[in-house]
């Protein structure tokens, strides 16, 4: 299909809007292996091979191996979506527009996690509201990395709120932003980097040098999305009922850098301020207590309903992105 660059961007934008709708309606189908799982399998396999090839080469060898891993994953996952999209066009040439739109829209939906975050976090909310603490503890363990066995009901609710607030950026706004500019390949490239960071981006003896390139690349890619997420959530606090926009703005500006990562606290700070909650703080991971600064003010006791409110902020932020993209497509 012959299209101008503007027409091509509009087409990718329309596919992204379709992907948002698909994600809202069906989320991630359980019967379909998710691309992020495949990314994880590839990262683990490539890590083993690269470590064998660079065994005994020291810090520089580990750093080079990590850079090769990152570059390889980025190239592979940049190409895969375009291959799928063009395969759809070749298989159904008479329906090229529809086939491309459907293929792109479905790929985009797989890169967005709004429905998945909502579904899993609301399991925690409903369990807590029903008084089923052990069930809530199990449900929250499915979406957080910390040790949940030491959490009381308030700690369980807080962990769920933090997860929604933090992942609103790397699970929703960031992939949306990359796909808005670069099509579905932008989303898969971003997710590949984000998955690498979650697997090898640790500052420990095993990954300090091997995972450094992936961790820094992830920090770079999330600079704009994380800050945009915080701003959108502050706007949501001004509009949504039961939230405090003034306090959200205050806490966002004050606490958005209270994290070891330069990008992780922006959404949490806006959410904490909007709900007058204190989030973050010390947490147990694999039997070790990790000291972390608090985010927000301890103005009131956290409640299960705050999980629902955090989801409202996430959907509001995504909704503004959808509205902005739709307006641009119509006026350009």
Provide a role label for each language-model segment:
Residues 198:
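Glycine-rich phosphate/dinucleotide-binding loop and adjoining beta-alpha-beta core of small-molecule
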Residues 1-189, 193, 201-332:
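Hydrophobic alpha-helical transmembrane segments
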